[in-house]
C-alpha cells in the first residue's frame, strides 16, 4: 500500500484542503482526514494542515507496514503503539531530529485520541 498527501486548492467549506489518500485507489484515509477537517474548522492555517498531513502520512506508512492497512481500529491500539513508532523513527538512517520525532508522535497521538478517545 502506498499513501500520499494531496492538496485541493478549492475544498468544501468544512474540509481541509490537505488530504491523505491511498495512492493507487485514491481512497481517503478516514481517521486522518476527519482529524484534519476538525483542525481546519478550528481555523488552522493551510501550511499547518499540510505539515500535519505529512506527519500523519509518515505514521500511516509505518502503521500499514505492520498491519497491512491504513485503517486503525481501537482494538489494534495498545499502550505501546506510540513507543513502537518512536523506536521505529529512532532506527531510521539518517535519523530524524528529536523535534521531528516529537512532532510526529504528538500529532499522531492527537489524531488517534480524536478518533478513539477511550483507547489506551
Q: Can you name each region flagged by the protein language model?
A:
Residues 33-47, 56-120:
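N-terminal core-binding DNA-recognition domain of tyrosine recombinases/integrases
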Residues 1-61, 65:
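Basic/aromatic DNA-contact patch characteristic of tyrosine site-specific recombinases
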Amino acid at each position: 500500500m502506498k499513501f500520499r498527501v494531496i492538496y485541493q486548492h478549492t475544498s468544501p467549506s468544512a474540509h481541509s484542503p490537505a488530504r491523505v489518500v491511498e495512492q493507487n485507489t485514491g481512497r481517503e484515509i478516514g481517521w486522518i482526514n476527519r482529524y484534519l477537517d476538525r483542525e481546519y474548522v478550528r481555523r488552522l492555517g493551510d501550511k499547518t494542515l499540510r505539515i500535519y498531513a505529512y506527519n500523519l502520512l509518515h505514521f500511516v506508512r509505518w502503521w500499514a507496514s505492520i498491519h497491512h492497512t491504513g485503517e486503525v481500529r481501537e482494538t489494534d491500539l495498545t499502550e505501546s503503539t506510540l513507543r513502537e513508532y518512536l523506536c521505529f523513527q529512532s532506527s531510521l538512517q539518517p535519523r530524524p531530529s528529536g523535534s521531528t520525532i516529537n512532532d510526529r508522535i504528538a500529532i499522531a497521538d492527537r489524531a488517534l485520541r480524536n478518533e478513539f478517545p477511550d483507547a489506551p
